[in-house]
């Protein structure tokens, strides 16, 4: 995971100081990219601090449910969306709604995930295998517009899925470690349910930033030598991609340094 640490270091040392929506301020660069290869059951995961993998998996299952209410997250003691929910736990038409029930002008609903699985199975050479959460007609109704907003899936000649994610806004210290593992697991799930295998995860960032109140935490993380990537993720099979539960995911060999706490910029 040295490439992630190199990006942190670059933004810390070369990033321009910028005021932002939250009022905290950032150091940022625009347009960097990270690439991660899959090897067997290994998944890309940060070792220089602990990544809350239960939260990663529960959030992904929540997306796949098509939910926009934090009730499922709270039931599983995952509180990463609390700050943006209203008194009823609603977030507006965020990721789950767009992934599973994108509304057309005729009032029909499009299940992008089902379409992606079907296309991977039946037309893997397609250049139109795209997952999009940036619904411009509903952005104003979302309590937080999508940061990881769109990805394209491609299948290579060996039956390997390559996921290319575009993330318009990348909180490098808190958010991106989560996003890396989340889209790695999504790639594994899509591969499982389409008879393929996971090959590569590419992440292209728009505004890649470190919040000013994360600077000391980033320096601490950069002082740590990355541990060997030995983490394997085993996933029990299910009839379809939507029927998975948390207990299906078994993480083995994850070695990490202690947690580094930081405040989320809201």
From Swiss-Prot:
Q: Which residues form a coiled coil?
A: none
Localization (cell): Cytoplasm
Catalysed reaction, written as an equation? dUMP + (6R)-5,10-methylene-5,6,7,8-tetrahydrofolate = 7,8-dihydrofolate + dTMP
Q: Which residues bind dUMP?
A: 21, 127-128, 168-171, 179, 209-211
Report if keyword Cytoplasm is assigned: yes
Q: What is its main location?
A: cytoplasm
What parts of the sequence cross the membrane?
none
Q: Which UniProt keywords apply?
A: Cytoplasm, Methyltransferase, Nucleotide biosynthesis, Transferase
The record's annotation in CDD domains points to: TS_Pyrimidine_HMase
One Pfam family name from the record? Thymidylat_synt
Family that this chain belongs to? Belongs to the thymidylate synthase family. Bacterial-type ThyA subfamily.
Q: Name it.
A: Thymidylate synthase
Record organism: Brachyspira hyodysenteriae (strain ATCC 49526 / WA1)
Q: Tell me the lineage of the source organism.
A: Bacteria, Pseudomonadati, Spirochaetota, Spirochaetia, Brachyspirales
Its gene? thyA
């Amino acid at each position: 995971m040295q490439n992630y640490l190199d990006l942190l270091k670059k933004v810390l040392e070369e990033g321009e100081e910028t005021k932002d929506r939250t009022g905290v301020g950032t150091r940022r660069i625009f347009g960097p990219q990270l690439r991660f290869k899959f090897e067997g059951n290994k998944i890309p995961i940060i070792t220089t601090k602990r990544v809350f993998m239960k939260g990663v998996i529960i959030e992904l299952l929540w997306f796949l449910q098509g939910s926009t209410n934090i009730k499922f997250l709270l039931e599983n003691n995952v509180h990463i969306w609390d700050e943006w929910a209203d008194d009823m736990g609603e977030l507006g038409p965020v990721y789950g709604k767009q992934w599973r029930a994108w509304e057309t002008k005729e009032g029909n609903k499009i299940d992008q995930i089902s379409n992606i699985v079907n296309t991977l199975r039946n037309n893997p050479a397609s250049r139109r295998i795209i997952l999009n959460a940036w619904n411009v007609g509903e952005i104003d109704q979302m309590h937080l517009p999508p940061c990881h907003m769109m990805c394209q899936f491609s299948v290579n000649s060996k039956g390997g899925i390559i996921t290319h994610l575009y993330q318009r806004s990348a909180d490098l210290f808190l958010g991106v470690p989560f996003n890396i593992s989340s889209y790695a697991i999504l790639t594994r799930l899509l591969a499982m349910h389409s008879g393929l295998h996971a090959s590569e995860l590419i992440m292209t960032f728009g505004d890649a930033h470190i919040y000013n109140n994360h600077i000391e935490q980033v320096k601490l993380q950069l002082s740590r030598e990355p541990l060997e990537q030995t983490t394997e993720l085993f996933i029990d099979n299910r009839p379809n991609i939507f029927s998975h539960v948390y207990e299906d995911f078994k993480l083995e060999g994850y070695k990490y340094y202690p947690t580094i706490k930081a405040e989320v910029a809201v």
